[in-house]
């Protein structure tokens, strides 16, 4: 199950959450899944951090990069309210022929809006929850895959995903990424039909290489 996600076959009909510190490979996994998904439909990619590199898509897709880019709809969201508009208003209109939706990163703009104002934070939490519910509805209605990436926050024992129980509840598959002596470790923390799995991998020019 975990290897399938890393190599571009995220499960349809559910939300897969991938979280970890910066530079651990979240966007690479999203790109690999996008390249694979264009074989069965459009890919809708919402980039909230400017991390999606066309050059990286060309590297991984190689000779097929033009076909990949022609079948990707890329949104750049610059604030949390724009992200909300894209997910709530625009996605439902264009997902009929889609095979994958990516939101990379779903919490970065949300965290920028958080403040000391309790009422504002309650509103932001509600907006985030409604976004994720909409994504799940689209996944189920259109039988497509949804991948959301997430930031981390430090805890006493290391780090945990941002967004708390809200994102944990709606994500039926959760993958944690860690750096491991120059390589990477992926941990399947949650899945409806699978127990915990661990896979070592490294990021290479053509994508990801699984380490046996």
Curated annotation (Swiss-Prot):
* The keyword Zinc-finger appears for this protein: no
Q: Which GO terms describe its molecular function?
A: ATP binding; ATP hydrolysis activity; ATP-dependent DNA damage sensor activity; damaged DNA binding
Q: Determine the domain of life of the protein's source.
A: Archaea
Key words, A-Z: ATP-binding, DNA damage, DNA recombination, DNA-binding, Nucleotide-binding
Look up keyword Amino-acid biosynthesis and say if it applies.
Answer: no
SUPFAM superfamilies linked to this entry: P-loop containing nucleoside triphosphate hydrolases (SSF52540)
For ATP, which residues are the binding ones?
Answer: 20-27
Q: Which GO terms describe its biological process?
A: DNA recombination; DNA repair
Biological function: Involved in DNA repair and in homologous recombination. May regulate the cleavage reactions of the branch-structured DNA. Has a very weak ATPase activity that is not stimulated by DNA. Binds DNA but does not promote DNA strands exchange.
Query: Family assignment?
Result: Belongs to the eukaryotic RecA-like protein family. RadB subfamily.
- Name by which UniProt lists this protein: DNA repair and recombination protein RadB
Protein source organism: Methanocaldococcus jannaschii (strain ATCC 43067 / DSM 2661 / JAL-1 / JCM 10045 / NBRC 100440) (Methanococcus jannaschii)
The beginning of the lineage is: Archaea, Methanobacteriati, Methanobacteriota, Methanomada group, Methanococci
